[in-house]
Amino acid sequence: MITIDGSYGEGGGQILRTSIALSAITGEPVRIINIRANRPNPGLRPQHLHGILALKHLANADVKGAHVGSRELVFIPKRLEAKKVEVNIGTAGSITLVLQALLPAMAFAKNRVEFKITGGTDVPWSPPVDYLANVTLFALEKLGIMAGIKIVRRGHYPKGGGIIEGYVEPWKERRELVATKYSSIAKVEGISHATNLPAHVAERQAKAAKEELSKLEVPVKIKTEVSKSLGPGSGIVVWAETDCLRLGGDALGKRGKPAEVVGKEAAQELLEQLKPGYCVDKFLGDQLIPFLAFSGGEIWVSEVTNHLKTNIWVVENFLGKVFDLDGEVGKPGKVKVVRRVE
C-alpha cells in the first residue's frame, strides 16, 4: 500500500484528489495521512468527502476514514466499472474540484460514465465550470479524451444548488500532447453570467472585459447569460483560442464589487496568462499532469504553481519518475514527460 503524506507542499485537498484518482486507475491501495494539515480547518471537508464517495462507487472500493474532519484515509480500489455517478455536495462546495478527482478515473473506466453533480458551479478558490467546459475539456480532447459538460443550473456561495451533468467516454487512443509556444491567437470567447440579478450585471461584465481585451486586436465574442437559482451571483470566464490550446481568465462578482471591475479582472487575468507566449495557462497546468503521465508529451506553462509541483510529486509517488520540470514557482516553466506510463 502506498502512503501519501497529505501535508506535503501546500498540503491542500489536491493531494487527496490526485492520490485517490491514481489509486482507482492503477488498482494500487493508498493510505493518506495528515489530510489538509496546513489548512485552517484541517481534515476532510464535505466536497472532499463527496469526491471520495463518488470514486468509491466508481472503483468499487473499500474505504476507511471517510468522514468530515478525518485526517487519515485508506482507499482500496477494485474495478472501475460504474456507469453512472451522482454526487450531491449538499453545500456550495466546488463541483469542479470534485470533477478534478473524477475525470482521470472516469477516463480509465471500461464503459462510458455519465455523471450528475450538485453543489457550487462558480465559487471562490476553484475553477468555474465554464473554464472546465471550455478550456480543460478542449485540452483533454487533444489527448484523445471525449467528454462533455452541461450546466443545468448555476450555484454560488453560500447557497449552492448548482447542477451539472456530463459524460466521459473510455480513453481508447492516447495521443501525445506537445503544447509549447503559441504563434497566433485566432479569437477570444467568453461567457458572462448573472444569476438572480439584473441582466445589466452580465452585460456590464462582458463590456468591460471586451474593452480590456481589445488590445489583442483579435475578434472578441462574450455571450451573456441570465438565470435563476437558489441565490444570487455573477461571474465571467474568457478564453483565447491559440494555434495550440486555449488559455483562460476568470473572475467572480460579489456584493459591493462593480460589474466593470469583475469583467476587467477576468480580462487582465487572461492577458497575464498570454504574456509569456506559452500554450498552457497556470490553471490548466496542474490539471493536465495526471493525464500527461499516460499520454506522454511536453507542456510549457505560463506559470509554475505549487499545485503543479504537488501533482507531479503525487503522480511520481504512484508511478515512479515520469516528469522533468524546468522552472520555479511563480515563473513560466516547462514540463516534459521523460517516461510515459503504459
From Swiss-Prot:
<feature type="active site" description="Tele-AMP-histidine intermediate">
    <location>
        <position position="307"/>
    </location>
</feature>
<dbReference type="GO" id="GO:0005524">
    <property type="term" value="F:ATP binding"/>
</dbReference>
<dbReference type="InterPro" id="IPR036553">
    <property type="entry name" value="RPTC_insert"/>
</dbReference>
<comment type="function">
    <text>Catalyzes the conversion of 3'-phosphate to a 2',3'-cyclic phosphodiester at the end of RNA. The mechanism of action of the enzyme occurs in 3 steps: (A) adenylation of the enzyme by ATP; (B) transfer of adenylate to an RNA-N3'P to produce RNA-N3'PP5'A; (C) and attack of the adjacent 2'-hydroxyl on the 3'-phosphorus in the diester linkage to produce the cyclic end product. The biological role of this enzyme is unknown but it is likely to function in some aspects of cellular RNA processing.</text>
</comment>
<dbReference type="InterPro" id="IPR017770">
    <property type="entry name" value="RNA3'_term_phos_cyc_type_1"/>
</dbReference>
<feature type="binding site">
    <location>
        <begin position="283"/>
        <end position="287"/>
    </location>
    <ligand>
        <name>ATP</name>
    </ligand>
</feature>
<keyword id="KW-0067">ATP-binding</keyword>
<dbReference type="GO" id="GO:0006396">
    <property type="term" value="P:RNA processing"/>
</dbReference>
<dbReference type="GO" id="GO:0005737">
    <property type="term" value="C:cytoplasm"/>
</dbReference>
<keyword id="KW-0547">Nucleotide-binding</keyword>
<dbReference type="Pfam" id="PF05189">
    <property type="entry name" value="RTC_insert"/>
</dbReference>
<dbReference type="InterPro" id="IPR000228">
    <property type="entry name" value="RNA3'_term_phos_cyc"/>
</dbReference>
<dbReference type="InterPro" id="IPR020719">
    <property type="entry name" value="RNA3'_term_phos_cycl-like_CS"/>
</dbReference>
<dbReference type="Pfam" id="PF01137">
    <property type="entry name" value="RTC"/>
</dbReference>
<keyword id="KW-0436">Ligase</keyword>
<feature type="binding site">
    <location>
        <position position="100"/>
    </location>
    <ligand>
        <name>ATP</name>
    </ligand>
</feature>
<dbReference type="InterPro" id="IPR013792">
    <property type="entry name" value="RNA3'P_cycl/enolpyr_Trfase_a/b"/>
</dbReference>
<dbReference type="InterPro" id="IPR013791">
    <property type="entry name" value="RNA3'-term_phos_cycl_insert"/>
</dbReference>
<dbReference type="InterPro" id="IPR037136">
    <property type="entry name" value="RNA3'_phos_cyclase_dom_sf"/>
</dbReference>
<dbReference type="GO" id="GO:0003963">
    <property type="term" value="F:RNA-3'-phosphate cyclase activity"/>
</dbReference>
<dbReference type="InterPro" id="IPR023797">
    <property type="entry name" value="RNA3'_phos_cyclase_dom"/>
</dbReference>
<protein>
    <recommendedName>
        <fullName>RNA 3'-terminal phosphate cyclase</fullName>
        <ecNumber>6.5.1.4</ecNumber>
    </recommendedName>
</protein>
<keyword id="KW-0963">Cytoplasm</keyword>
<comment type="similarity">
    <text>Belongs to the RNA 3'-terminal cyclase family. Type 1 subfamily.</text>
</comment>
